[in-house]
């Protein structure tokens, strides 16, 4: 008998959802940085064996939206509550159960198994962990609580064991050689955006969107032209940097990661353009592929 199911990962920003999904899939599907709101889209990672297919979904961190981009990000997270066969709610040892009460109420109403994963337990002690488990049990009494450390890979095998037990009997939903639902261009934009998140401070990384305008691939190499959109002329200057040095650093580091990702030589050209207030524009968000009501 073949098993297949959708395992959706939700939770607040910066609790380790993307790191966990990459571990579970065994491939680097989602970018993961130390900054909150790194993930903007719902991203599928597909794990295949002879008798099983697990379709994981990484989602943006749950937050109260301040502009339309964040509304779209919340839509991705809420949609993951609807179509899951198993729901992974990821928290950490700092977060309290009463955060985001509205979203937690929606989690309580799902009618599928919920695994509540307390991540980063390497940063706390046993006494505090026991107290936290009790608090989460009061918040989600039907959930199965598993303390983990994605960074140390502690108990991740236990999570996978429970997922395999919980997903239903079903034929596969995707081809057995398929790793994700996203095209190659998407991963180019994410890798470039990851470098921007790592190398720039404050609001700059959050005002950035990346679009691949050219992607030409042959047997040995890929030629890529990418545009980095910002909201202000001042942001454009910061991204480019003095004599273009900042942008060159981003492009160089992105190229290295892309070569590892695609296992081909990468020729990357980057440009910076201003798209004023794109994060608050329905039209621009739709053009950039975000989900709106």
Write out the residue ranges for each language-model feature.
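Conserved, well-folded catalytic cores of nucleic-acid-processing
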Residues: 27, 46-50, 84-87, 94, ...
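Active-site glycine-centered loops adjacent to acidic/histidine catalytic or metal-binding residues
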Residues: 58, 119, 149
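P-loop NTP-binding site
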Residues: 184-293
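Canonical P-loop GTPase G-domain recognition
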Residues: 113, 122-180
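Conserved glycine(s) of the Walker
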Residues: 16, 155, 246
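Conserved G1/Walker A P-loop phosphate-binding module
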Residues: 1-75, 79-81
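Conserved C-terminal guanine-recognition region of P-loop GTPase G domains, centered on the G4
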Residues: 51, 75-143, 216-218
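Catalytic P-loop NTPase motifs of RecA-like helicase/translocase cores
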Residues: 39, 62-64, 96-97, 124-125, ...
């Amino acid at each position: 008998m073949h098993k297949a199911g959708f395992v959706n990962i939700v939770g607040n920003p910066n609790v380790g959802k993307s790191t966990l999904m990459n571990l579970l899939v065994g491939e680097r599907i989602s970018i993961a940085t130390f900054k909150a709101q790194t993930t903007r889209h719902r991203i599928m990672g597909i794990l295949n064996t002879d008798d099983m297919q697990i379709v994981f979904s990484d989602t943006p961190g749950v937050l109260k939206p301040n502009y339309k981009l964040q509304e779209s990000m919340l839509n991705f997270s809420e949609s993951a509550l609807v179509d899951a066969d198993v729901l992974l709610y990821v928290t950490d040892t700092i977060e309290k159960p009463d955060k985001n009460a509205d979203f937690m109420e929606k989690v309580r109403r799902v009618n599928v198994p919920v695994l509540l994963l307390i991540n980063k337990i390497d940063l706390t002690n046993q006494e505090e962990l026991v107290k936290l488990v009790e608090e989460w049990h009061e918040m989600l009494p039907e959930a199965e609580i598993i303390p983990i450390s994605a960074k140390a890979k502690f108990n991740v095998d236990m999570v996978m064991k429970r997922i395999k037990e919980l997903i239903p009997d079903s034929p596969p939903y995707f081809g057995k050689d398929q790793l994700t639902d996203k095209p190659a261009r998407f991963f180019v934009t994410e890798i470039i955006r990851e470098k921007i998140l790592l190398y720039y401070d404050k609001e700059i990384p959050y005002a950035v969107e990346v679009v691949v305008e050219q992607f030409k691939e042959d047997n040995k190499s890929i030629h890529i032209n990418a545009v980095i959109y910002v909201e202000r002329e001042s942001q454009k200057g910061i991204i480019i940097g003095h004599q273009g040095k900042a942008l060159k650093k981003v492009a160089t580091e992105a190229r290295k990661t892309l070569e590892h990702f695609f296992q081909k030589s990468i020729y990357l050209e980057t440009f910076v353009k201003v798209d004023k207030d794109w994060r608050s524009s329905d039209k621009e968000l739709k053009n950039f592929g975000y989900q709106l009501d």
